[in-house]
Design a protein with these regions (language model features):
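N-terminal Rossmann-like NAD(P)+-binding domain of SDR-like oxidoreductases, especially those catalyzing
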Residues: 1-80
Length: 80
């Protein structure tokens, strides 16, 4: 199974990526890197796309062949 995670370089997305890698999934995902960091993911095991979720054309292209999508992208702000 192949899972695509939006917001993959953030706290939630990167932990989901680790979980699914351990379960044997193929993992790919995107992040605009506004709040996330590439240091949070293992790029040797994860296909990473620097895409804003509002870029539907690029997002659609990156999701080709994906079985599951997990949407973890969000704008995070202190005090919410």
């Amino acid at each position: 199974m192949h899972i695509f995670i939006t917001g993959i370089a953030g706290f939630l997305g990167s932990n989901l990526a680790d979980y699914y890698l351990k379960k044997g999934f193929k993992v790919s995902g995107c992040d605009n890197l506004v709040g996330g960091s590439l240091d949070n993911i293992d790029q040797s095991k994860i296909k990473f796309y620097k895409i804003n979720c509002e870029d539907l054309k690029s997002l659609s292209e990156a999701m080709k062949g994906v079985d599951i999508v997990c949407h973890a992208a969000a704008y995070a702000h202190e005090g919410l």
